[in-house]
Amino acid sequence: MAKYNDPLVRGRADPYVYKHTDGNYYFTATYPAYDRICIRKAATINGITDAEEKVIWRKHEEGIMASHVWAPEIHYIDGNWYIYFAAGESKRIWEIRPYVLQCTGPDPMTDEWIELGMMQAHRSPTGRRKTGYDSYSFTEFSLDATTFEHKGKRYMIWAEKVHRRFGISNLYIAEMETPNKLKTVQVLLCTPDYDWERIDFWVCEGPAVLKHDGKIFVTYSASATGQMYCMGMLSADENADLLDPKSWTKKRYPVLKTDPEKKVFGPGHNCFTTGDDGEVLCILHYRDYSDKYISGDPLNNPDRHAHVLEVQFENGEPVFRL
């Protein structure tokens, strides 16, 4: 008998689960209508399934933050709650950028959330001539921002497209100055090099961070959002300079991909959390049927469900077995 509900939550893609210091789990994910952000609170992982869903923010009617509300993540940083998410504009729905919400009180379920606006890139006060001016971050299609702390520094990793015409989606990393502003220029972390990252679209997105046994692992999702969607992985030594691309090693093959025999299609956009008994869990989404049953763009199909996968470790590295 499975330990965790399967699926954990139906109709929720891009799931994110945060376990707070009080032992409670907070769940958020992309809402199928792409028009709101909801959170759930539960004392156990399985409790998330039937937990009350609270709408804490809705899209704007016009202007920015008015369409394609995607991939929210809830974080607790320096005593405050934040949600990072991506959204497009009302008249330019693909002008997607990362935005930040902050909770005004200690209870994210009942206290008010306010908008801090778009994530801010690093800007040198002396202008472009000064070394360190970032004129690239968040200037193009940008989404899937995640954040983590390591050795007293906070970092952000996100996906951003380059070459607007061709649309390659890369992963970038930078140190953060505040919860809504970068401290350093962006550093290219990962680009779609391999065939399995280039099916229909050239994509690296949905980064998730896991620390284990002296290493930092970053999983990410590759290719288009149908059954070709899969997970890749990067790793770095915990003592390395995380802003040096040479510190990172990339797997040449996907660490998780479609398995028709197990009815797993397009696994990806995961996060990591700690299970009820302290085990490492991967929370991810996938469909339970093939793309051939989908009419139109898989992105518009609501049947991506949140699932739980217990992470195993071999030779110090995470292994993802369905």
Regions found by a protein language model. Give the residues of each.
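Carbohydrate-active catalytic/glycan-binding domains of CAZyme proteins
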Residues: 1-322
